[in-house]
Curated annotation (Swiss-Prot):
Protein name in the entry: Triosephosphate isomerase
Pathway stated in the Swiss-Prot or TrEMBL entry: Carbohydrate biosynthesis; gluconeogenesis; Carbohydrate degradation; glycolysis; D-glyceraldehyde 3-phosphate from glycerone phosphate: step 1/1
Pfam families in the cross-refs: TIM (PF00121)
Subcellular location field: Cytoplasm
Enzyme nomenclature, EC number: 5.3.1.1
Signal peptide: none
A GO CC annotation given for this chain: cytosol
GO molecular function: triose-phosphate isomerase activity
Protein role: Involved in the gluconeogenesis. Catalyzes stereospecifically the conversion of dihydroxyacetone phosphate (DHAP) to D-glyceraldehyde-3-phosphate (G3P).
Main location: cytoplasm
Group of enzyme by EC: isomerase
Catalytic residue list: 96, 168
NCBIfam families: tim (TIGR00419)
Length: 252
């Protein structure tokens, strides 16, 4: 089953609106056809209006880095999935380890967010990943499998087939340490196997699984050669236009 790759840059808390606009203008005309790959950037909430506007006539898709699970209400500081859809966002990244760690988000929160994102016609990119301690204890597949099952609970098979799962080992995020090709393949396959167990093999064959964690132009080709890796969620290398575009060289 051929799945279209998806390369998504996660800017995290970087770039002001002017910098976001300049980045989009630098990459937009150089992106490959959407027949070959989906390309997205996850912009901070303060940059979304500018980024969506700058990207609107290009193939570049735009993700929010988080949202709440309610559309409106007395939730000071939160981002409405309904408004994200009205603004023209395509994806929402949820469950990133930084959100889980610093802001104490639970699997239940992430599951509620996934449902709210789908209810508003957007696509979630759901992150999962283990700590170094869990990895070294040989419990990575078990731990990540539980995260994935909990995040997808109550979604329809059709919804799961259309979403993106991003496996990011916490010990490889922004550390310069990256998982080996075998680690990435084995864990992305483990993620897919959980989907197969919960929703059937047909759904598992359709869902796209990204690898994330110190992905760079120099190693992206190795990861993309893995049969169960359908893309990358990229932090640092997505901040500069040149390095972001170089991530797409795996197509050549």
């Amino acid at each position: 089953m051929s799945r279209k790759p998806i390369i998504a840059g996660n800017w995290k808390m970087n770039k002001n609106p002017q910098e976001a606009k300049a980045f989009v203008e630098a990459v937009a005309s150089k992106l490959p056809s959407t027949d070959l790959v989906d390309v997205a950037v996850a912009a901070p909430a303060v940059d979304l209006v500018t980024t969506i506007e700058a990207a609107k006539d290009s193939v570049l898709k735009v993700a929010a880095q988080n949202c709440y699970f309610e559309n409106t209400g007395a939730f000071t500081g939160e981002t409405s999935p309904k408004v994200l859809a009205e603004m023209g966002a395509d994806y929402v990244v949820i469950g990133h380890s930084e959100r889980r760690d610093y802001f104490h988000e639970t699997d239940e929160d992430i599951n509620k967010k996934a449902k709210a994102i789908f209810a508003n016609g957007l696509t979630p990119i759901i992150c999962c990943g283990e700590s170094l301690e869990t990895y070294e204890a040989g419990k990575a597949a078990e731990f990540v499998g539980a995260q994935v099952s909990a995040a997808l609970a109550g979604l329809s098979a059709e919804q799961v087939a259309s979403l993106v799962l991003a496996y990011e080992p916490i010990w490889a995020i922004g550390t310069g340490k990256s998982a080996t090709q075998d680690d990435a393949q084995n864990m992305c396959k483990a993620v897919r196997d959980v989907v197969a167990a919960d929703f059937g093999q047909e759904v598992a064959d359709k869902v796209r699984v990204q690898y994330g964690g110190s992905v760079k132009p120099e190693n992206v080709k190795d990861y993309m050669a893995c049969p169960d890796v359908d893309g990358a969620l990229v932090g640092g290398a997505s901040l500069e236009a040149d390095s972001f575009l170089a991530l797409l060289d795996f197509l050549n």
